[in-house]
Amino acid sequence: MMSAPKITFIGAGSTIFVKNILGDVFHREALKTAHIALMDIDPTRLEESHIVVRKLMDSAGASGKITCHTQQKEALEDADFVVVAFQIGGYEPCTVTDFEVCKRHGLEQTIADTLGPGGIMRALRTIPHLWQICEDMTEVCPDATMLNYVNPMAMNTWAMYARYPHIKQVGLCHSVQGTAEELARDLNIDPATLRYRCAGINHMAFYLELERKTADGSYVNLYPELLAAYEAGQAPKPNIHGNTRCQNIVRYEMFKKLGYFVTESSEHFAEYTPWFIKPGREDLIERYKVPLDEYPKRCVEQLANWHKELEEYKKASRIDIKPSREYASTIMNAIWTGEPSVIYGNVRNDGLIDNLPQGCCVEVACLVDANGIQPTKVGTLPSHLAALMQTNINVQTLLTEAILTENRDRVYHAAMMDPHTAAVLGIDEIYALVDDLIAAHGDWLPGWLHR
């Protein structure tokens, strides 16, 4: 290793995300002199990120260098860490297409980035480019560690380790640590007092144990307190981001039924199951406060907010931000210095969870040190949680097989097995929907889908 790492960002035009990750990086002593290589295909967005990153670096007293690239392989050369954060096809046209075509066929969605027709199409658009990153890494930085933040996380991660098993990679999300903080806030307790053990699949992991530290140093189960707060109307608290559309009722109701709390948000979870979004059942939407079309609304708001923020950053002499809850800088620091840390990552199920399929993508606690990312064994999940996860893994299995073998039929089979889609549409209607999505996305999808 050199004295300072090289950190390459693929999709550096995702300026808000880059800002959060590098804000953390620049405050770690071992990473302050890192070479930051920013790469994006959009020169304007790339330059915007460059402005923000330079001010972040200077404000934090970091002294590394920044290079900007529109060519991926050039940016990756000799990298130690590769952070991937992009959206193939963007909000427009592709996300809009996913929502509008599905709606024409009678299928409502909330986020559409993980499962269902929206998640399936996003995977088909995204995986070929992730594979190209793996190809380039194999050639110019074979020992680098990839930190992948791109959804649909499980399918993307699975497709990469299936085709490029030699690439060191982990899929990262902030739902485990983020929800833990959220639950602490709901109960008015310090998040630092929490202790938990969590496992499952991306966006559907559960806190198998959730405890808080008491005054005498012992730990007590937090679940009875959490349930009592919900039933008394004291939890959940209003959305911390001020988003009144997202009220977090779905997860608390699932907690009442299952006995365990899930990591991903209510707006996500509502579309991973067959129970909350049904034609003609406005009563369910109202009762559970399901925010239909949430992701497109969020995209419009974020774009507007970003333009405002960017103007402020351009005028500011310095940029100081609070530490984020993202794992990226923790992982880099642990690998670079050997100082051990524990994170939650999405990895191949090599005997980690006994009652989920071997080889599927699971989210578990991982030890990180100079040896890299080392997933920890969970054992057997409660059977009802594993059964629920399996309904989502079915879709992931078939879609991953579809793209690995270029089997168009498996794309339809994946959509057929989606719990929400199957609860709303008949078989022929599902096939017609997939036909229309493939046609509408055109060249954003791999050529074999159009043969």
From Swiss-Prot:
It comes from the Bacteria. GO terms for biological process: melibiose catabolic process. One of its GO terms (molecular function) is manganese ion binding. The active site is at 174 (proton donor). Its cofactor is NAD(+); Mn(2+). It holds the Pfam family Glyco_hydro_4C. The keyword Lipid biosynthesis does not apply. CDD domains: GH4_alpha_glucosidase_galactosidase. NAD(+) binds at residues 5-71. It is an enzyme of class 3 (hydrolase). One of its GO terms (cellular component) is cytosol. Mn(2+) binds at residues 173, 203. Its EC number is 3.2.1.22. PROSITE patterns: GLYCOSYL_HYDROL_F4 (PS01324). Belongs to the glycosyl hydrolase 4 family. Homodimer. This is Alpha-galactosidase. It comes from Escherichia coli (strain K12).
